[in-house]
Amino acid sequence: MKRELSGGYELDDDPARIDIDAVHDFVSNHSYWAPGRSRQVQEELIAQAIRVVALYRDGEQVGFARAVGDSHLVYLADVYVLPEHRGRGLGVELLREMIDNGPYAETRWMLHTADAHKLYERFGFGPASDRVMERARRT
């Protein structure tokens, strides 16, 4: 569903509209969580997502978020707003569309993050309980 925002921005959850090259460029070259990720892997991750939401300004993709999971647990990944578009509340709107306005609003969500904790706390995220375990990726 497309949602207009002020300042010429819009949110859209249409997977066909996602600019995979734009996502790949940011995630592979500018993120701390997936430097060097191949375009093929990025394309597969987007194809396997249960929900994607992108942020556009005048038709150009300037933000993105992806969710994987099922009706019981959703994992939030690859969330970004390009640096030149930050500081306008767009990250809040991107997450609101992804989490609160989507079909998984009542589902348990998880994420890994090294920054933006205050932003995620606005959507109910907090430290994981002692019952959560993680297996690191093998290299």
Regions found by a protein language model. Give the residues of each.
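Residue-level recognition of the GNAT/N-acetyltransferase active site
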Residues: 82
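Conserved acetyl-CoA pyrophosphate-binding loop and the N-cap/start of the following alpha-helix
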Residues: 85-94
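Conserved N-terminal entry element of GNAT/NAT acetyltransferase domains
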Residues: 1-16
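Conserved GNAT-fold acetyl-CoA-binding loop/helix
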Residues: 14-42
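Active-site-proximal cofactor/substrate-binding loop regions of enzyme domains
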Residues: 98
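Conserved active-site alpha-helix within GNAT-family acetyltransferase domains
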Residues: 92, 104-139
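A conserved beta-strand-loop-helix scaffold within acyl/acetyltransferase catalytic domains
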Residues: 42-58, 63-79
